[in-house]
Swiss-Prot record:
Superkingdom, taxonomy of origin: Archaea
Enzyme class of the recorded protein, top EC level: hydrolase
Record GO terms (molecular function): alkylbase DNA N-glycosylase activity; DNA binding
Protein name: Putative 3-methyladenine DNA glycosylase
EC annotation from Swiss-Prot or TrEMBL: 3.2.2.-
InterPro entries xrefs: Formyl_transferase-like_C_sf (IPR011034), MPG (IPR003180), MPG_sf (IPR036995)
Length: 200
């Protein structure tokens, strides 16, 4: 499948967040190529979104968010877990999509070796920190161009048929913005990090 072009990311973030479901996230490692089907995302949109890192303006940490769409924004949470975001919308507008979970489709043995505590297929990348661990995504990739066939990129894939939209996870501090239904996941995937209430 072809690598997604920059135009894919240069669109409203909510559209990109939904359309990334079903696409293939690829990481080229010394041990070989590993790939995940993206099954869960979250949208973070601009300085008016209190859950967004850009809500208080540009900093050294979030500078990539203000740049060109189609680049990786990687940051650390809890001092130990990396999180991968893909920058969206026009250059200068801070928005991105967090890749929350993925389903292993290639190089599962390599990913399992990077996440030895994950004993089952659906546990390998069922969360943003787990996903980055399984694909060896670190802050060294912050700012990487995912529209080029380099170390990290996204390939096209079939659209997801049933998408669940619900509030984002871990953003209670954001007030009313915490209630926005800006988390999206593939209803039929067993690899999502957490299902919405009532979705069994």
């Amino acid at each position: 499948m072809p690598v997604l072009p920059r135009d894919f990311y240069d669109r409203p973030t909510l559209e990109v967040a939904r359309d990334l479901l079903g696409k293939t996230l690829v990481r080229q490692l010394p041990a070989g190529r590993v790939a995940l089907r993206i099954v869960e995302t979250e949208a973070y949109i601009g300085e008016n979104d209190k859950a967004c890192h850009a809500s208080k303006g540009m900093t050294a940490r979030n500078r990539v968010m203000f740049g060109q769409p189609g680049h990786a924004y990687v940051y650390l949470i809890y001092g130990m877990y990396n999180c991968l975001n893909l920058v969206t919308e026009k250059d200068g507008y801070p928005a991105a999509v967090l890749i929350r979970a993925g389903e292993p489709i290639e190089g599962e043995e390599i990913m399992s070796s990077l996440r030895p505590k994950a004993r089952k297929h659906h546990e390998i990348a069922s969360g943003p920190g787990k996903l980055c661990g399984a694909m060896s995504i670190t802050r060294a990739l912050n700012g990487a161009d995912v529209c080029a066939s380099g170390e990290l990129y996204v390939e096209d894939g079939p659209a997801v048929k049933k998408i669940v939209a619900c509030p984002r996870i871990g953003v209670d501090y954001a007030g009313e913005d915490a209630l926005r239904p800006w988390r999206f996941y593939d209803k039929n995937s067993p690899c999502v990090s957490k299902r919405a209430p009532g979705d069994i």
